[in-house]
């Protein structure tokens, strides 16, 4: 079945409401394998931050999960696809940046918290830049989530679990960078 971006996003949000666990990578893995999530695409602008919000809530973080996910979907749907290559900022990072802003309730007129999430986004973008391209929405999500887990622990005192990340999406990614990817699974061979 072919889904619109709105339908993909609605299914992601519905899945997050139902899923347990405090590991954003495991939440991502459970949802990213569904038919409504493509290998690459702007649904990641909703999915990546939604996994962080879900894990944060499940770990005891103080948010109204339904309202937070709806707000994230609104923000994520406003981000166009291919911003990584066209604007120089990755949608995985902006999605999680939006999730952090939702947790804090910050906006463009916030004073003391205004720049705090930029510390996260700049660190995550620096890590992505070091890996290089071409883009991979899965690899970028993994890097952005890893960076977010330590940020969330330091900023909010909420511990999210994070198991070692191993990518199983390589066979479906025609542009996989293989062993240059920090998450490449050896059984998928050299590229």
Predicted regions located by residue number:
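Cys/His-rich short segments
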Residues: 1-6, 170-171, 178-191
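Non-catalytic, interaction-prone regions of core transcription and DNA-replication machinery
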Residues: 2-28, 78, 82
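Polybasic, low-complexity association/targeting segments
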Residues: 15-49
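A short glycine/serine-rich beta->alpha loop
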Residues: 30-42, 78-88, 128-132
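Short, contiguous, pocket-lining structural segments
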Residues: 40-44, 48, 88, 136, ...
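Conserved mixed alpha/beta catalytic, RNA-binding, or beta-rich assembly cores of soluble enzyme
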Residues: 46-59, 66-114, 118
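C-terminal domain-closing interface element
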Residues: 139-168, 181
């Amino acid at each position: 079945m072919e889904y619109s971006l709105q339908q993909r996003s609605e299914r992601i949000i519905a899945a997050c409401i139902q899923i347990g666990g405090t590991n954003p990578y495991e939440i991502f893995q459970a949802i990213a394998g569904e038919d409504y999530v493509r290998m690459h695409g702007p649904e990641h602008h909703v999915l990546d931050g939604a996994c962080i919000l879900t894990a944060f809530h499940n770990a005891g973080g103080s948010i109204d999960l339904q309202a937070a996910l709806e707000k994230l979907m609104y923000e994520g749907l406003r981000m166009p696809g291919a911003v990584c290559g066209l604007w120089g900022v990755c949608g995985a990072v902006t999605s999680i940046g939006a999730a952090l802003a939702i947790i804090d309730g910050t906006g463009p007129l916030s004073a003391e918290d205004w720049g705090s999430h930029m510390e996260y986004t700049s660190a995550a973008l620096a890590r992505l830049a070091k890996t290089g391209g071409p883009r991979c929405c899965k690899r970028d999500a993994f890097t952005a989530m890893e960076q977010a887990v330590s940020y969330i622990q330091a900023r909010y005192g909420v511990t999210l679990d994070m198991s070692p990340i191993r990518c199983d999406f390589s066979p479906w990614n025609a542009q996989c960078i293989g062993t240059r990817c920090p998450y490449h699974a050896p059984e998928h061979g050299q590229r």
